[in-house]
């Protein structure tokens, strides 16, 4: 089950001493200790109920689901990711220790699915937020496909080189955001003749100084442009 091909791991001396490299030993030790963080937002996540059952029993791969990102090294994303959920997903990914991996499960996670059609609130692909190692298409994917994706990820882990992994982690730092808490104040609004309608301009186009406008107490009659 856990046997992987290591180029330097099979060489033995006449005294039955295994000679290998630190890189291969590190990869071998992580093969059976992938602890996933299950991030499900839609119907694809229901397939995990079958995967955890006795028929498929994904515990045999050493997968122990964790509820804390600081104890996980694999995150399984399943379901639609909305704009409101995007910062939470990025924060969970950043809280995971290195090395860490991502499996995108389902069409909604990979491309946004049918919910991304003419939708302003759906992220069209989780890879726009965090780097993805394995894509698992389907609506929803079967438990056998999930096991196959985990097997492919384990093969990738077994062939990793420490220098390449470190360089890849530095390149992916572009996904890091500075989490700083700001004092939330009244949001801006536009006063139309027909009534008060909230402005739909994306927050990325509004400077942070203009986005939060200080008012000690604001009533509905005091909202101006």
From Swiss-Prot:
Alphabetized PROSITE patterns for the sequence = COMPLEX1_20K (PS01150)
Tell me, what is one Gene Ontology molecular-function annotation carried by this entry?
iron ion binding
Mode of membrane association: Peripheral membrane protein
Enzyme class, top EC level, equals translocase
Family classification: Belongs to the complex I 20 kDa subunit family.
Assembly and partners? Answer: NDH is composed of at least 16 different subunits, 5 of which are encoded in the nucleus.
* Protein name according to UniProt: NAD(P)H-quinone oxidoreductase subunit K, chloroplastic
């Amino acid at each position: 089950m856990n046997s992987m091909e290591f180029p330097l791991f099979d060489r033995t001396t006449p005294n039955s001493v295994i000679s290998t490299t630190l890189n291969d030993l590190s990869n071998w030790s992580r093969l059976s200790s992938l602890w996933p963080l299950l991030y499900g937002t839609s119907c694809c996540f229901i397939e995990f109920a079958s995967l955890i059952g006795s028929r498929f029993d994904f515990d045999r791969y050493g997968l122990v689901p964790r509820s804390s990102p600081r104890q996980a090294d694999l995150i399984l994303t399943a379901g639609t990711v909305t704009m409101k959920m995007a910062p939470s997903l990025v924060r969970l990914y950043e809280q995971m220790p290195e090395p860490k991996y991502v499996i995108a499960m389902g069409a909604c996670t990979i491309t946004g699915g049918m919910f991304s059609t003419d939708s302003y609130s759906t992220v069209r692909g989780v890879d726009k937020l965090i780097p993805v190692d394995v894509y698992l298409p389907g609506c929803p994917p079967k438990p056998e496909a999930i096991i196959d994706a985990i097997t492919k990820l384990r093969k990738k882990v077994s062939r990793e080189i420490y220098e390449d992994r470190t360089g890849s982690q530095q390149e992916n730092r572009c996904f890091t955001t500075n989490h700083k808490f700001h004092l939330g104040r009244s949001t801006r609004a536009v006063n139309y003749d027909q009534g008060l309608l909230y402005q739909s301009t994306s927050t990325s186009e509004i400077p942070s100084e203009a986005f939060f406008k200080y008012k000690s107490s604001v009533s509905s009659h005091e909202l101006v442009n």
